[in-house]
Amino acid sequence: MGEEHMDVWMLNRKILPNDLLDIFSALGNLQAQYDWVITDHSMWYGKNCPEAVCKRCQRAGLLMTGRELTEHLRAGYVWFLDGAVLSAVPLGMREEDVNLYEPVWDVDFCAPDYRFQTPLTRLELILFDGWAWVIVCNAAFSKLVQSRLPQAQPPDAFWKAFG
């Protein structure tokens, strides 16, 4: 995405009864519009989680379709715990295309020179310390966040609320 400016939005996880599914739903079933590279994640696995799903989700640099991610979340198979980076990449992405890049994730998502973890990424959802979801996106997508997730705040306002 080059040198494009990124906007950052933050949401307290406690205000989202269905967690990540609420973000997806508010943003027009966002998960179905992309495939997802999931890295730096810690997950809880439900008692009903099939062994194959547990093993798959334990991989680093996991590539998953939005449909599959939604199914696992809705079924209660998985839940993100302390952290995760979910990078939206174009639909139909092949795992070998994703593996061409070593994920480079920058903790300072508010930095003016923040870069997505791969050049294929269109937006990122970051679970910050287990209690806040962060949306990093371009200005056009930012307008959608503002209109459909009014509880999302820019980082300065978000941190001030915890002041």
Predicted regions, residues:
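Surface-exposed, low-hydrophobicity interaction/linker segments
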Residues: 49-125
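N-terminal interaction modules that seed assembly of large macromolecular complexes
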Residues: 14-70
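Asparagine-biased alpha-helical interface segments
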Residues: 8-11
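Short, flexible coil/linker elements and helix-boundary hinge sites characteristic
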Residues: 35, 61, 76, 149-150
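Generic structural motif
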Residues: 14-16, 41, 91, 128-130, ...
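Acidic, proline/glycine-rich low-complexity IDRs
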Residues: 4, 113-163
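Short glycine-rich, low-complexity/disordered patches
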Residues: 32-43, 81-86, 117-119, 158-162
